[in-house]
């Protein structure tokens, strides 16, 4: 959903302080002239190439001049620079067009496709994949997945992605994140056997995992409770029954 508001004196902002950007708080704004549509009118777009805490502010001063400030969110952010060290701030991509919001979007799209995306799939057609999640949730084993792959192959699907539930003792969403070893009760022959069987059906094999998260009920958390993001001397705050690993630690 596109949210529009008129500029006014003072500061308006969008920001994220949750450690991520994504669809919740997209690090993007567009300033458009009055009357601009999808096909016509002036528009300036700015997008931060950054997935962490960010802030984008639009300020209109007493002379009706507009200043746009975009970058790392300053809340709780510090960075110590030793002599001769450097710091690289997030890059921003800025677009101007007088052909409306649609052309702005297309310019962003072409720019990212040509200059930002490094995937080998950039210029080729992506495979069609089917994911096990909505079909089985946590209730599957290797035979059920192979049968799933067999039916998917009939529809021209190119890849089966095995989703959540294949690791640790994961039978629901409240355990085992961080224990990235195969649940052999479900995958009796292990990963290699399952992959070979899915490949034999003519499908590639993909696997889901969430390496940045850790469940309180996991071997990893029991061994290293200090590895999750936390504030010393305060009770940890779970979200979705899980914690976030502190990826700034080399041991993590």
Stretches with model-predicted labels:
Residues 1-112:
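N-terminal accessory beta-strand-rich subdomains and adjacent acidic, glycine-rich linkers
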Residues 9, 23-25, 34, 109, ...:
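Histidine (H) residue identity feature
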Residues 121-252:
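Aromatic-lined carbohydrate-binding/catalytic grooves of carbohydrate-active enzymes
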